[in-house]
């Protein structure tokens, strides 16, 4: 075809001949191309028109007008036939028999075949018909098949896709919300619980991953089915208006096969089970757990109250020890002074000093008792508040560990 096109091309405009005219030298050119050359020759000549020369061989021709040149009807007809052949679709060939055109339609297998397939191949005993009859029959079949496929399970697939995406979104929202609760709860605990907090948050992330692993494959399957369905629609839209029988039958075969594959693909379920933890998670269930037993618990156990109380007798004993300590500190000094002096004046001085010591000691003890009472009162208040706060934290953490079997 390329070599033929070279012979049908005008040397001047390099396009297919348009109204070809033959010169006396037998060279062919388009009429418009010759008119352009002749017009330029006349314009450049001031006195008389110069002789017209062939653009190929430069042989002179009398410039009596282009219309006087003979039309090459043979070349013009060849160009017209070439244009028709170039525009018409190329005849498809058989894949099994090289170079054989697909010019027969097998009604048994509903596909295009060649003559060898019909006489010596696997279609020997099948029923055949002409391309025109097959085109008319398949054209009617296409309309009904297209209408039935247009609404085939598309609504069901879209509904299931929406259900799965909604379920996935809600599940992830629940897990995210629960994860935030755990983060807020563990932020109030001591640093010794950080490792346990990270383990629990890791469990939530694992559950998120499990949800995504459960939902994503099904969602991807539905997206693939819908994408295949859209591709089938695009194929149908592309060739439903095709009037060429061969091209239509070939496209119809591909369309039927794609529809068959789509219909045979099962739709995944839309009611995947959710984890019970996503529905029943509540941090209030941690309130009865003991923090002291966090590292020991693996199953829920009876909850109780952690009691830490300092008896009042301890404070009485502390005061007695303090008084005895004062006597021990000041007693040896007074005893030494008594043993060193024998006269009465010395004893009187010692007694006077002892009396002074007793007075100072009594004042000191009185002030010590007063400040100690203030300290113990403040300590009792702080102890009660700290005890209540500690009990709440201990019970909550122990309940959480028992419930979720973290150990």
Swiss-Prot record:
SUPFAM superfamilies, alphabetized: B-box zinc-binding domain, RING/U-box
Gene Ontology cellular component list: cytoplasm; endoplasmic reticulum membrane; endoplasmic reticulum quality control compartment; perinuclear endoplasmic reticulum
Catalytic activity as recorded in UniProt: S-ubiquitinyl-[E2 ubiquitin-conjugating enzyme]-L-cysteine + [acceptor protein]-L-lysine = [E2 ubiquitin-conjugating enzyme]-L-cysteine + N(6)-ubiquitinyl-[acceptor protein]-L-lysine
Processing and modification events after translation: Auto-ubiquitinated; requires the RING-type zinc finger. Auto-polyubiquitination leads to proteasomal degradation.
GO molecular function: transcription coactivator activity; ubiquitin protein ligase activity; ubiquitin-like protein ligase activity; ubiquitin-protein transferase activity; zinc ion binding
TM stretches of this protein: 317-337
Keywords, ordered alphabetically: Coiled coil, Endoplasmic reticulum, Immunity, Innate immunity, Membrane, Metal-binding, Transferase, Transmembrane, Transmembrane helix, Ubl conjugation, Ubl conjugation pathway, Zinc, Zinc-finger
Binding site for Zn(2+): 94, 97, 117, 123
Note: Located on chromosome 13 within the minimal deletion region for B-cell chronic lymphocytic leukemia.
Domain remark text: The coiled-coil domain is required for the induction of autophagy during endoplasmic reticulum (ER) stress. The RING-type zinc finger is required for auto-polyubiquitination.
Oligomer and partners: Interacts (via C-terminal domain) with VCP. Interacts with AKT1; the interaction ubiquitinates AKT1 and leads to its proteasomal degradation. Interacts with MDM2; the interaction ubiquitinates AKT1 and leads to its proteasomal degradation. Interacts with p62/SQSTM1. Interacts with TRAF6. Interacts with IKBKG/NEMO.
Protein name: E3 ubiquitin-protein ligase TRIM13
